[in-house]
């Protein structure tokens, strides 16, 4: 896989072309950012751990019937995935109050909800990813009504699967972000879960102590960022023997 053609580089990942036009390589970087890139650093090993954790979780979701872009783990930093045209909407599922949600509604971090809350954000760095309503999504034709309803159902199903999985290893899934898309050059494609599921995209707390095991360790200057990521990987037993 030498001299790979770079298709796209984001804050946390690089996408490379392959010989198959329907598949790409997703490479995980060590960069970490917060507050819409206003805060940034290099956390050595982060990309490796996120690659392992996301690969592990995607495979678990596939086993439960969720369609994802994941194909296979290639090496410590890379995975082979289906080439997806991403829908410009981030789906956030909240099980407990945390972060900006707590500030917006002036409630304590860790307050549980009677049922999960689903929020939608428009993926646009220049606009700081504004929160949008279902009306916005339909009016701007980012999704059809049928697709929107399917994403809500899929998101809640994914939440149930991941919440149970994390609970079984002593971790609370506080909230997390999902991205969906369609197969490249296929407008009639079904919806696929894409991007990653990792401590970069999830809030994960130790069940017993509420110790934060995710990107909040960086956002909130708690220190030992990589230790939180390592703890998640080890609790999940997500590091394979390559």
UniProtKB/Swiss-Prot annotation:
SUPFAM superfamilies (alphabetical): SAICAR synthase-like
GO cellular component: cytosol
Matches recorded under Pfam families: SAICAR_synt
Keyword Methyltransferase in record: no
Regions crossing the membrane: none
Annotated catalysed reactions: 5-amino-1-(5-phospho-D-ribosyl)imidazole-4-carboxylate + L-aspartate + ATP = (2S)-2-[5-amino-1-(5-phospho-beta-D-ribosyl)imidazole-4-carboxamido]succinate + ADP + phosphate + 2 H(+)
Enzyme Commission code(s) on record: 6.3.2.6
InterPro entries: SAICAR_synt/ADE2_N, SAICAR_synt_PurC, SAICAR_synth, SAICAR_synthetase, SAICAR_synthetase_CS
GO molecular function, one term: ATP binding
Keywords: ATP-binding, Ligase, Nucleotide-binding, Purine biosynthesis
One Gene Ontology term from the biological process aspect of the record: cobalamin biosynthetic process
PANTHER family in alphabetical order: MULTIFUNCTIONAL PROTEIN ADE2, SI:DKEY-6E2.2
Family: Belongs to the SAICAR synthetase family.
Name of this protein: Phosphoribosylaminoimidazole-succinocarboxamide synthase
Organism: Ehrlichia chaffeensis (strain ATCC CRL-10679 / Arkansas)
